[in-house]
């Protein structure tokens, strides 16, 4: 019976051409959908390179009526650096906060991205997501360090180990005033620059557009990084907060990690109310 049906279909193949075309289109579309769903499921299961559980992102607001003169060091200290440091200190000392960090640059789960090109020979350029961070950032986000783990294994205090406003959110090891600048690069960027992700500690590279005047030293290599659950792994570079952060009065983000037992359903509401009261 089946043979008879197949024979009849073959004999009427000219008249049923549209049917075969329709089946082919359905098959291709179904294959495409299944392939896409498999890709999403596979990407979701891959580590992101950071841990956002019990992590909150805070936005600082400024007083638009308060003019701060960039040319006046006293004005910057009184109305910008000191209030920001005080706000950061209060956030760190809030009950239930395990750690806190300040950062700027490429954000996760958003379209806010900052890119820059880097090179080792002025010929080939490798683009990377840029993130400027205080040294506590690696503890807050729990970023796995593949090489150079000793750099952030100690108890880093952003204020005790620094002097002056230019290093307010740095440390002795994470110093934005030294040359070459320390940088933590992802495995992908290490492989793009040096064609290997191992044994690159201490190696130097520089900004493709600024030339060798802006040099970086690999202080550590972190795990693969991606911007959201379903994104592909991308090249990332993390470095100390730059000098223009202080000159231009940039308003940073603050990320905090809350202890699991303190991260209740009303934590965000309670935190906002008590910190602004």
Where do the language-model regions lie?
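Short, strongly hydrophobic transmembrane alpha-helices
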Residues: 12-42, 50
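Short beta-strand segments
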Residues: 19-22, 57-60, 100-104, 183-186, ...
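Membrane-proximal extracellular/periplasmic loop immediately following the first transmembrane helix
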Residues: 37-125, 130-131, 176
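Hydrophobic, well-ordered secondary-structure elements that form the walls
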Residues: 91, 138, 271
């Amino acid at each position: 019976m089946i043979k008879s049906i197949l024979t009849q279909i073959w004999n009427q193949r000219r008249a049923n051409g549209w049917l075969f075309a329709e089946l082919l289109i359905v098959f291709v579309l179904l294959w495409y959908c299944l392939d896409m769903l498999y890709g999403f499921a596979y990407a979701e299961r891959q580590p992101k390179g950071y841990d956002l559980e019990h992590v909150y992102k805070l936005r600082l607001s400024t007083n638009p009526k308060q003019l701060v003169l960039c040319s006046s060091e006293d004005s910057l200290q009184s109305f910008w650096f000191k209030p920001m440091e005080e706000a950061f200190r209060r956030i760190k000392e809030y009950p239930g906060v395990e750690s806190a960090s300040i950062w700027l640059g490429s954000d996760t789960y958003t379209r806010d991205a900052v890119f820059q090109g880097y090179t080792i020979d002025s010929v080939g350029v490798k683009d990377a997501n840029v993130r400027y961070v205080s040294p506590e950032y690696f503890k807050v986000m729990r970023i796995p360090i593949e090489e150079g783990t000793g750099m952030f294994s100690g108890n880093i205090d952003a204020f005790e180990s620094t002097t002056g406003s230019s290093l307010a959110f740095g440390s002795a090891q994470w110093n934005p005033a030294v040359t070459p600048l320390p940088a933590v690069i992802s495995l992908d960027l290490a492989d793009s620059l040096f064609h290997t992700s191992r044994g690159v500690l201490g190696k130097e590279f520089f900004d493709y557009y600024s030339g060798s005047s802006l040099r970086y030293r690999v202080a550590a290599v972190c795990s693969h990084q991606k911007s959201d659950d379903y994104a592909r792994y991308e090249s990332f570079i993390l470095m100390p907060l730059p000098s223009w952060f202080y000159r231009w009065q940039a308003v940073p983000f603050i990320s905090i990690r809350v202890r699991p037992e303190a991260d209740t359903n009303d934590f965000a509401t309670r935190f906002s109310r008590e910190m602004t009261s």
